[in-house]
């Protein structure tokens, strides 16, 4: 499991839609690059740019730390934790009914200070997410809120080479409402149209979010994420790319995703 960086803003967005509702679209937040949460300089939340006044959709596309830290604080630790739990991000993912992934970690709890809540809401701090759980969430957003089980194993064999019977899991799990899934699909599509560039991902009809998790103060040590799916009935594929020591999500993990997805669409994989 890895620090999710700004991919966690997908989770904070879902929680905002669940707890604040549609009013979140009509509001604006002021980003002056630095947010003084509590008067303690070390707790200041820093943004990647001075965005000025931004709405919800623009804040996600520009990955505004100030906006999403303030949204997380407004939602509160308990409700944000409930969203994380309901999306399955602290649970292991079972593959082919037999293999369990690592579990995620989410430590935010009632009574935690605003600074901790704010940093958590933008995917920094102690939160850890397993790529398999993030992939399951991407599948759910693309699939009307329903997550499908993962089956990647054709068969199991014992030491004698005999096939062991196992039952494939086919049960879908409703992780979020179809309405919120649809809204998240639109928001993630807007990320690509307005920020990453449809021209860079031509023909993919991509819905995505990048993330750059800062492990220390060295960019080369960052964990780079690029997550999402193709909104395409002929190529209904979700993806998660995680690059350890990857510098930047959009610059490192994004091109990796593009190469694989284009190979799928072009039939050259």
Regions found by a protein language model. Give the residues of each.
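Short, gly/Ser/Thr-rich active-site loops of penicillin-recognizing serine hydrolases
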Residues: 163-164, 168, 256-269
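Short, charged, low-complexity patches
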Residues: 134, 249-258
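Beta-lactam-recognizing serine transpeptidase/beta-lactamase-like catalytic domain environment
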Residues: 1-5, 11-245
């Amino acid at each position: 499991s890895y620090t999710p960086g700004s991919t966690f803003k997908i989770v904070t967005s879902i929680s905002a839609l669940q707890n604040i509702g549609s009013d979140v679209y009509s509001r604006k937040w002021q980003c002056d690059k630095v947010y003084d949460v509590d008067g303690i300089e070390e707790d200041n939340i820093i943004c990647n740019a001075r965005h000025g006044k931004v709405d919800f959709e623009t804040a996600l596309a520009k990955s505004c730390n100030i906006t999403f830290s303030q949204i997380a604080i407004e939602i509160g630790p308990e409700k944000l934790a409930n969203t994380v739990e309901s999306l399955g991000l602290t649970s292991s993912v079972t593959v082919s009914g037999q293999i369990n992934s690592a579990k995620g970690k989410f430590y935010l709890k009632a009574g935690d200070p605003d600074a901790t809540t704010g940093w958590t809401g933008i995917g920094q701090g102690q939160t850890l997410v397993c790529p398999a759980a993030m992939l399951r969430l991407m599948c759910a957003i693309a699939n009307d809120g329903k997550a499908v089980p993962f089956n990647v194993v054709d068969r199991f064999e014992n030491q004698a080479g005999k096939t062991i019977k196992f039952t494939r899991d086919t049960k879908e799990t409703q992780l979020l409402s179809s309405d919120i899934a649809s809204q998240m699909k639109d928001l993630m599509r807007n990320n690509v149209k307005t920020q990453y560039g449809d021209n860079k991902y031509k023909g993919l009809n991509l819905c995505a979010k990048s993330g750059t998790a800062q492990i220390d103060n060295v960019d080369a040590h960052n964990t780079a994420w690029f997550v999402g799916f193709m909104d395409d009935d002929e190529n209904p594929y979700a993806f998660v790319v995680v690059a350890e020591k990857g510098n930047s999500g959009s610059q490192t993990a994004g091109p990796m995703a593009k190469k694989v997805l284009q190979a799928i669409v072009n039939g050259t994989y």
